[in-house]
């Protein structure tokens, strides 16, 4: 019996057509609302669902691309105490996230890939926006008088 999976299961991912025994389909998949039987109506719904998922994926990629451009245009300025050789403190992902939020850019703290910047001057921090997209944020650290 052919069924369309509604949710991910051990048999396959959501929105895929699989072939299972009628008993398994009736007693487990349909009962737990994990699948629906394959027929003309559900096949049309599946095509629409896949198109909708593809559209959403493209929109998300466009948003990520815009966010990357916005982040790469930005320069964050921080002040740290210290003298010529040593710096007291560091710029952490938490501080960077806070500054980005002030500028209206919201990213997850784990997306900011830094172990703490503790040198004066210009540095670049990678911000992982998706599995394929990484933005480089420019950070300038000056001496606090």
From Swiss-Prot:
Gene3D superfamilies: Ribosomal protein L9, C-terminal domain, Ribosomal protein L9, N-terminal domain. GO terms for molecular function: rRNA binding; structural constituent of ribosome. One of its GO terms (biological process) is translation. Pfam families: Ribosomal_L9_C (PF03948), Ribosomal_L9_N (PF01281). GO terms for cellular component: ribonucleoprotein complex; ribosome. Keywords: Ribonucleoprotein, Ribosomal protein, RNA-binding, rRNA-binding. InterPro entries: Ribosomal_bL9, Ribosomal_bL9/RNase_H1_N, Ribosomal_bL9_bac/chp, Ribosomal_bL9_C, Ribosomal_bL9_C_sf, Ribosomal_bL9_N, Ribosomal_bL9_N_sf. It comes from the Bacteria. Belongs to the bacterial ribosomal protein bL9 family. Binds to the 23S rRNA. This is Large ribosomal subunit protein bL9. The gene is rplI.
């Amino acid at each position: 019996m052919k069924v369309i999976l509604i949710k991910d299961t051990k048999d396959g991912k959501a929105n895929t057509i699989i072939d299972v025994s009628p008993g398994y389909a009736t007693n487990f998949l349909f009962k737990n609302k994990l699948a629906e039987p394959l027929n003309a109506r559900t096949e049309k719904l599946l095509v629409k669902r896949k198109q909708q998922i593809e559209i959403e994926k493209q929109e998300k990629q466009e948003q990520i691309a815009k966010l990357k451009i916005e982040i790469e245009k930005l320069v964050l300025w921080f002040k740290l105490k210290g003298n010529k050789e040593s710096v007291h403190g560091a710029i952490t992902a938490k501080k960077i996230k806070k500054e980005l939020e002030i500028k209206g850019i919201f990213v997850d703290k784990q997306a900011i890939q830094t172990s703490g910047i503790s040198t004066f001057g210009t540095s670049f921090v990678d911000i992982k926006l998706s599995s394929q997209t990484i933005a480089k944020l420019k950070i300038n650290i000056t001496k606090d008088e």
